[in-house]
Amino acid sequence: LLVDEYAKRYLPEDTARFAYLLSRLKKSMTSLLCYLRDEQKQSCFHPAACELRIGSGEDAVPGQVYHLSDGRTVQLVGTVDRADEWVEENGTRWVRVVDYKTGTKKLNLKEVYCGLDCQMLLYLFSLTRDKSGRFTGAEPAGVLYLLADPAPKTTNRQQAQQDVQYELDGLVRDEQKVFDAMDADETGRYLPFGYRNGVPSPSQKDKRADIAKLNRIQLHLDDLVTQMGQQLYDGQIAAEPLVAGAGKNPCVWCDYGFICCHETGIGERALEAPAKPFEPEETENEKEGEQA
């Protein structure tokens, strides 16, 4: 009803195509709102802020400041779609970052290791490093990508008439109480992994990280941002795109190819990351034990 009133007042165009697009938008909005309602009803995490600014200004969370070797600095700025908070009975505070995406999204730690898809993790660590604001002392619970407008799938008519199944991706703190706080009934609908025989799926272990692993990710990203900042100040901006794999060449959708004149296949970098990024290095004894 609200959408119809708004459209009538501000969008007077009345064509068959417009009517179809409007009906599709209403259906999508209704489905998403119902999903968010159901998720909030069972979750211990609740929105603490939406469109939360990181950087400077009123109501903003201070962005992390990175100090370079020559005395210059780099400051993180941005906007968090949604920051959720959970406070335990003992006073322990947890914070998670939620990002709404369209289409598909998969968080790949190998890509994070190389400097891709770092945004939400950098935002999370800025919140947990907040020394005097609303998130002071909060523990990192993770980052979630909510596919708010899933890419269309080929399916039969009966399945197409069912409710949209929203998918989550991301990285969550590897503690059972955090899982329960996000997905009380262990349905797998509200976590980036499912359950198998009553336990988190072993095949989706890369969607979970204990505090030690999160700390390693944080330190690695600190080094990456510092390195990037130094290179920018030094004028090192060669057109050498990082191609993460087949179909992942960033030049395909870049609007500035006519400026850098990059030629596909020339001067491109490939992913160079450990097989298990951010995991502790195995000792010789551990390697021998696995081989035995």
Language-model-derived ranges and their functions:
Residues 1-292:
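Structural signature of nuclease core domains in nucleic-acid processing machines
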